[in-house]
Amino acid sequence: MKFRLRFTSEARKKLEELSKQDPKKNKKVLKTLGLMETNLRHPGLKTHKYDSLEGPNGEEVFEAYVENRTPGAFRVFWCYGPNEKEITILAITPHP
């Protein structure tokens, strides 16, 4: 299933920062976002529910891997919605 990505202002700001400050990491994030648009079950994403957060309206939040086995490995936190076939990128951040 193909999804349209929406970004919170926090996530968009982080993506813009990465494009200027760390192009290599930005490229990895863009690859992850591309996979999320087309296949949330891609094995490289290791997508799973993240119980410590809730979406803006109480939605379940999920985590997708940008990197693995790397100090400060980046993750993308997201939730379904607000509309059908959309996911909202809540944060792009190093693993908490």
Put a short name on every predicted segment:
Residues 1-73, 80-96:
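Basic, Lys/Arg-enriched alpha-helical interface segments
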